[in-house]
Amino acid sequence: MSRLLSVPGGPYAPPVPARELTVTAADGARIHVEVHGPERAPAVVLAHGWCCSTAFWAAQIRELAADHRVIAYDQRGHGRSPANPAYGTEPLADDLEAVLAATLAPGERAVLAGHSMGGMTVMAAATRPAVREHVAAVLLCSTGSSRLVASATVVPLGEGRVRTWLTRRILGSRAPLGPVTPLARRILKYGTMGPGSGPHMVEACARIVHACPRRVRHGWSQVLDLLDLDHGVRELRMPVEIVVGAADRLTPPSQARALAAALPDCVGLTELEGLGHMTPVEAPELVTGKIRALAAAHIPSARAERAVHAEESA
């Protein structure tokens, strides 16, 4: 589904994976997984956000797969992972743990990048054995750990009960999104992207978001409304870097700053002027560079490969 409804060409068109597999989570949920790049290359795992799919990471996959093994999966109910009646942060953690166990060798380390709900998945799974075993470093893009509805600035009012009530009604709406029209693009850009985002970026995100089933969109909106993962943030003991758009209306910079203050080992916080919530699409080179740098710094095989390349070019 995610490949059929995404843009057909350009940097945001989903690359064809080297292989695909279905992973079964603890409760029986079936999770669609794609693997790109050389099998023995340093591993990167990508977890997308609410209403998205593996297609959201197309730009990162395209660049990283040249010299990394890139593992991307569809969150339950999204993309090509079938819907499941279980909604909650524990099922998200179950799914991530199952993906790590199925795609990484015992003791193998990877960089884990999560955008929005994907970042929340990382926080929810912070104490899971598979995360402790396999995750060498984390990149959190445009995410938060609690008070999401209260802190969102989609509604242009001051913080308070009225704004929170209106935001809850908007984000939790059961209304169908319908086809991707010029009006739909304008609405999506206002809510999720910065003023500098080009039409090709808006088109890519609109196609991905509009492909999400209405029931799935609403079900996960209820989880995000009640989200409280502050405890999970404190359990992320590996190096963690954060990226946020300064114009992010869904998880504003205040969320990123709170994460940076709470993390045991925050190695950087980058606030991107003029960008919104969809940072991997709006700033693809920067996000890809952050992932690549974390892999080079924290995965032994990546460090060795970088040293070999340096010697060859000397």
Language model: regions and residue ranges:
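Flexible "cap/lid" loop of the alpha/beta hydrolase fold
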Residues: 127, 131-171
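Conserved alpha/beta-hydrolase "acid-adjacent" motif
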Residues: 249-255
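Short beta-strand/loop motif that positions the catalytic acidic residue
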Residues: 236, 242-244, 248
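Conserved acidic catalytic loop of the alpha/beta-hydrolase fold
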Residues: 93-109
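Gly/Ala-rich beta-loop-alpha elbow adjacent to hydrolase catalytic centers
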Residues: 114, 118, 122
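Conserved alpha/beta-hydrolase catalytic His-Asp/Glu region
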Residues: 146, 173-234
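Conserved HGGG/HGGXW glycine-rich cap/lid loop of the alpha/beta-hydrolase fold
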Residues: 29-83, 89, 102
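Catalytic histidine-centered segment of alpha/beta-hydrolase-like enzymes
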Residues: 250, 269-289
